[in-house]
């Protein structure tokens, strides 16, 4: 069911970079192969004073609470993860299928996740600040990586997804300006997950959350997994709701004000 829309999307993307097509790179010696076409460049974004902030963290780390806290701020747009799409692709639920049998459905889900997150990154930005729940970067560096490391994704699937991801990085603007990492103990996430009782999450074991936490630490804290796409602001997120809201308020300027983002990973 996913192949037809993906073929159409791929054909459209590739046509954008054919010589002679609108937005295609110039041909000839010394010409650059990569051109971002309709998507704004980093310099254009800086000129327009628009920024993209991604809230990253484990399952049940408090990302939704963070997004809701800042959603009423002036001139900010919030993009949540397109979970409803992952639960219903023309009547199919690839998210639920993946949690039931990751070896069989991991590639199916992550291919669609990569597509839908690309759509999130490249849709027109109307506000000065865009706050996103996760990113195409964590989809690849955390969740695809976990499937592969755990032996639930064959190497050929991993390589194909990685090739798609690398092509996207080279040819499209999925850059971000700040990562807010809600650093949460896996046990805390597990208890929250059980309390909120989402259908697909009922089968998630603590070991899975521990693996996801470990990859976040490698990527965003140690910097030993993959390149970090932006400066990282770490917020310890094991606290109760009232304390988390206080921490969000304390970090408001560091999150929303561009000149306060020179944080480093």
Swiss-Prot record:
It is found in: Mitochondrion. InterPro entries: DCK/DGK, Deoxyribonucleoside_kinase, DNK_dom, P-loop_NTPase. GO terms for biological process: carbohydrate derivative metabolic process; DNA biosynthetic process. Its EC number is 2.7.1.21, 2.7.1.74, 2.7.1.-. Its main location: mitochondrion. The active site is at residue 133. CDD domains: dNK (cd01673). Keywords: ATP-binding, DNA synthesis, Kinase, Mitochondrion, Nucleotide-binding, Transferase, Transit peptide. Residues 21-45 are annotated as: Disordered. One of its GO terms (cellular component) is mitochondrion. Residues 21-31 have a biased composition (Low complexity). It catalyses: thymidine + ATP = dTMP + ADP + H(+); 2'-deoxycytidine + ATP = dCMP + ADP + H(+); 2'-deoxyuridine + ATP = dUMP + ADP + H(+). GO terms for molecular function: ATP binding; thymidine kinase activity. SUPFAM superfamilies: P-loop containing nucleoside triphosphate hydrolases. ATP binds at residues 57-65. Phosphorylates thymidine, deoxycytidine, and deoxyuridine in the mitochondrial matrix. In non-replicating cells, where cytosolic dNTP synthesis is down-regulated, mtDNA synthesis depends solely on TK2 and DGUOK. Belongs to the DCK/DGK family. Homodimer. This is Thymidine kinase 2, mitochondrial. It comes from Macaca fascicularis.
């Amino acid at each position: 069911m996913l192949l037809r829309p993906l073929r159409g999307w791929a054909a459209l993307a590739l046509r954008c970079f054919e010589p002679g097509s609108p937005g295609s790179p110039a041909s000839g010696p010394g010409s650059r192969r990569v051109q971002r076409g309709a998507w704004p460049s980093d310099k254009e974004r800086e000129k327009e004073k628009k920024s993209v902030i991604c809230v990253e963290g484990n399952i049940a780390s408090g990302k939704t609470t963070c997004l809701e806290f800042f959603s009423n701020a002036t001139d900010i747009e919030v993009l949540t993860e397109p979970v409803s799409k992952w639960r219903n692709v023309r009547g199919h639920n690839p998210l639920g299928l993946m949690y039931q049998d990751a070896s069989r459905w991991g590639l199916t889900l992550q291919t669609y996740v990569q597509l839908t997150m690309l759509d999130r990154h490249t849709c027109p930005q109307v506000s000065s600040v865009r706050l996103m729940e996760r990113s195409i970067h964590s989809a690849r560096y955390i969740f695809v990586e976990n499937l592969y490391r755990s032996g639930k994704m064959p190497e050929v699937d991993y390589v194909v997804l990685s090739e798609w991801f690398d092509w996207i990085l080279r040819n499209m603007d999925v850059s971000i300006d700040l990562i807010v990492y809600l650093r949460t103990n896996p046990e805390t996430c597990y208890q929250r997950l059980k309390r909120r009782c989402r259908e697909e999450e009922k089968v998630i074991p603590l070991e899975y959350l521990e693996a996801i936490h470990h990859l976040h630490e490698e990527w965003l804290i140690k910097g030993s997994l993959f390149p970090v796409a932006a400066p990282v602001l770490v917020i310890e997120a094991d606290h109760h709701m009232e304390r988390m809201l206080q921490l969000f308020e304390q970090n408001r300027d560091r999150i929303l004000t561009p000149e306060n983002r020179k944080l480093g990973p």
